[in-house]
Amino acid sequence: MALEKSLALLPLLVLVLLVLGWVQPSLGKESRAKKFQRQHMDSDGSLSSNPTYCNNMMRRRNMTQGWCKPVNTFVHEPLVDVQDVCFQENVTCKNGQANCYKSSSSMHITDCRLTSGSRYPNCAYQTSQKERHIIVACEGNPYVPVHFDASVEDST
């Protein structure tokens, strides 16, 4: 009798273990869209000419853990405006993929470049503010930016 009940619960136990095995790896893992936002969005960031902006932001956004990320760009526009770029001019990505899009208008950005001679753990960045078109790679449902590909000057 007890054996029959145990055997009846076996398929349920197997199902629970399969679901846990499928769900568990994705728990706590940052999505590509969230990583893009962490690494590139600073909608509330001031456009002051603070020379330590990049040093502070790169550290705060976890891009100097274990190494110094050599180049990064922060976009100072509302997230929805950056997400809208995914429905603007389609361009080829630097890696040859076809899922990149160029913003139809210039956006306020800050470029951060690792200064020569800078070594981990003392990552030091040069901060330069610009107004440029951005190019982002998009994917997913909803279709959102997942990679910052480039920034380009106005071609007029």
UniProtKB/Swiss-Prot annotation:
EC number: 4.6.1.18
Gene3D superfamilies, A to Z: Ribonuclease A-like domain
Active-site residue numbers: H40 (proton acceptor), H147 (proton donor)
Gene name of the encoded protein: RNASE1
Keyword RNA-binding: no
Cleaved signal peptide residues: 1-28
Keywords: Disulfide bond, Endonuclease, Glycoprotein, Hydrolase, Lyase, Nuclease, Secreted, Signal
Residues that carry a glycan: N62, N90
Residues bound to substrate: K35, R38, K69, P70, V71, N72, T73, K94, R113
Assembly mode: Monomer. Interacts with and forms tight 1:1 complexes with RNH1. Dimerization of two such complexes may occur. Interaction with RNH1 inhibits this protein.
Protein name: Ribonuclease pancreatic
Entry keyword Disulfide bond: yes
Cysteines engaged in disulfide bonds, as pairs: C54-C112, C68-C123, C86-C138, C93-C100
InterPro entries: RNaseA (IPR001427), RNaseA-like_dom_sf (IPR036816), RNaseA_AS (IPR023411), RNaseA_domain (IPR023412)
Family: Belongs to the pancreatic ribonuclease family.
GO MF annotation list: lyase activity; nucleic acid binding; ribonuclease A activity
